[in-house]
């Protein structure tokens, strides 16, 4: 099987084109309807949430002896009004977070960097070679789809074992393909290309940067290979990893260029800006656009559950024996346990997300810090490249003016300066003399 000269010329021309990615041009999708399965999950979550709250509300109201029941009897309208305001405030914040989009990357971003007024708009394809490397090909103007499919099939079958990403195979670093492809080297058995890519060799959320990148870049330069110093320090390797990082990636599911801090959600089947997590309680993702609403919901729900616990414990009847006590209070024991257990989770999440906001992180980045491509080189240094200080992080979060164009990785010099600043600032919990956090 051979590629015709037209396709070769298109690949060579596209490799020489300027493919600069500008995060300012990212379009957030607010129109496209969600996937039917996601919409069903959201409706189911809303139904369960409302049903549980309605049942607990009825138990609290009709239970004799509670302070709420006493307020109804005494016609204490002030107490009734503010308690019900807390209840409806929590319900309102839930419907707000469950209906607001997290910040999906619009599929129209497929042609962001192309001139749509010209006939030469490029189309993006992902091909895997025999080493599991995934370059981005911009084939211009129109690819031969049958040959591309055959190439992709050949590439997958040419290697017996292709190491693939176990968690998320959708995000790959956006690299440039080499300028020339030797047409004579393409045959029915193998397809060889000279590319600068990142091999997906681990079970990370997005492919990690391998220390073998230097070998791949210099495999055709025997002098550099022979003169390679095998005793490089860990600091030098980390610096090299930082230099290789890119400020944007490519999603092979959505076929769009995406900025940093963006992840493809398997359940929503969309790329989410500043992906935090997929929450089953709201039936959707938490991301850039609804993280503030999610924090507000956690606060309102915590206050509601705390108030509900305060009211329901006043409805317990005292008895002489444990058996009689259980029999007399059997109706409110399950709701009490439900409220107490429910209170622990949103309050703990509220505290955790408050910490994430002050440090400018997401749950995904916090949990997978050492496995995410663009954060892995910084993990050994203990630096968050997006942290601008607690006060600045909080102001940007509350104003809601955070932009994907602000998510730019630090240079080696900036990392070293931040490290020196942290070393010079004495921290009672973690410093150069001892660490209380391991």
From Swiss-Prot:
The keyword Acyltransferase belongs to this UniProt entry's keyword annotation: yes
Bilayer-crossing regions: 48-68, 77-97, 294-314, 330-350
Major place of residence: membrane
Gene Ontology biological process terms from the UniProt entry: protein targeting to membrane
Keyword Lipoprotein included in the entry's annotation: yes
Topology within the bilayer: Multi-pass membrane protein
InterPro entries referenced in this protein's UniProt entry, alphabetically: Palmitoyltrfase_DHHC, PFA4/ZDH16/20/ERF2-like
Low complexity bias locations: 190-206, 218-234
A GO term from the CC aspect: Golgi apparatus
Catalytic activity field: L-cysteinyl-[protein] + hexadecanoyl-CoA = S-hexadecanoyl-L-cysteinyl-[protein] + CoA
Record-listed E.C. numbers: 2.3.1.225
Glycosylated residue positions: 12-13, 119, 144, 157, 231, 360
GO molecular function: protein-cysteine S-palmitoyltransferase activity
Source taxon at top rank: Eukaryota
Renumbered residue ranges of the record's region Disordered: 183-239
Name of the top EC class for this enzyme: transferase
Residues covered by the DHHC domain: 249-299
Pfam family of the protein (one): DHHC
Location in the cell: Membrane
Alphabetical keyword list: Acyltransferase, Glycoprotein, Lipoprotein, Membrane, Palmitate, Transferase, Transmembrane, Transmembrane helix
Domain notes: The DHHC domain is required for palmitoyltransferase activity.
PANTHER family (UniProt xref): PALMITOYLTRANSFERASE-RELATED, ZINC FINGER DHHC DOMAIN CONTAINING PROTEIN
Annotated family: Belongs to the DHHC palmitoyltransferase family.
UniProt-recorded name of the protein: Putative ZDHHC-type palmitoyltransferase 7
């Amino acid at each position: 099987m051979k590629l015709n000269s037209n396709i070769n010329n298109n690949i060579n021309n596209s490799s020489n084109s300027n493919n600069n990615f500008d995060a300012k041009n990212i379009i957030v999708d607010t129109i496209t309807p969600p996937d039917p399965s996601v919409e069903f999950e959201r409706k189911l979550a809303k139904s369960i949430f409302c049903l549980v709250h309605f049942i607990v509300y009825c138990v609290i109201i009709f239970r004799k002896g509670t302070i709420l029941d006493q307020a109804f009897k005494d016609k204490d309208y002030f107490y009734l009004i503010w308690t019900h305001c807390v209840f409806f405030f929590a319900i309102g914040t839930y419907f707000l977070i469950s209906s607001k989009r997290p910040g999906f990357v619009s599929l129209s971003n497929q042609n962001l960097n192309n001139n749509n007024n010209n006939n030469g708009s490029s189309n993006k394809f992902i091909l895997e070679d025999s080493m599991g490397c995934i370059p981005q090909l911009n084939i211009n103007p129109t690819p031969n789809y049958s040959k591309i499919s055959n190439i992709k099939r050949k590439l997958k079958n040419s290697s017996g074992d292709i190491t693939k990403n176990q968690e998320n195979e959708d995000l790959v670093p956006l690299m440039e393909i080499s300028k020339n492809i030797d047409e004579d080297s393409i045959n029915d058995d193998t397809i060889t290309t000279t590319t600068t890519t990142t091999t997906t060799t681990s079970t990370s959320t997005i492919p990690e940067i391998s220390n073998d990148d230097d070998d791949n870049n210099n495999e055709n330069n025997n002098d550099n290979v022979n003169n390679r110093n095998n005793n490089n320090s860990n600091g030098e390797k980390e610096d090299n990893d930082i230099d290789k990082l890119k400020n944007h990636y490519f999603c092979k599911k959505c076929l769009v260029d995406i900025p940093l801090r963006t992840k493809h959600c398997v359940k929503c089947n969309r790329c989410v800006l500043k992906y935090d997590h997929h929450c089953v309680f709201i039936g959707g993702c938490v991301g850039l656009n609804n993280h503030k609403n999610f924090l507000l919901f956690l606060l309102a729900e915590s206050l509601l559950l705390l108030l509900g616990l305060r009211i329901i414990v006043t409805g317990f009847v005292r008895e002489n024996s444990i058996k009689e006590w259980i029999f007399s209070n059997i109706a409110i024991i399950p709701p009490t346990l439900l409220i107490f257990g429910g209170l622990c989770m949103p309050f703990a999440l509220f505290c955790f997300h408050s910490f994430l906001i002050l440090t400018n992180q997401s749950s995904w980045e916090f949990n997978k810090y050492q496995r995410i491509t663009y954060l892995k080189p910084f993990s050994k240094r203990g630096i968050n490249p997006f942290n601008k200080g607690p006060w600045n992080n909080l102001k940007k979060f509350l104003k809601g003016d955070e932009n994907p164009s602000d998510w730019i990785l630090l240079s080696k010099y900036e990392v070293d300066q931040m490290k020196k600043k942290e070393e010079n600032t004495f921290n009672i919990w973690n410093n150069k003399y001892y660490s209380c956090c391991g």
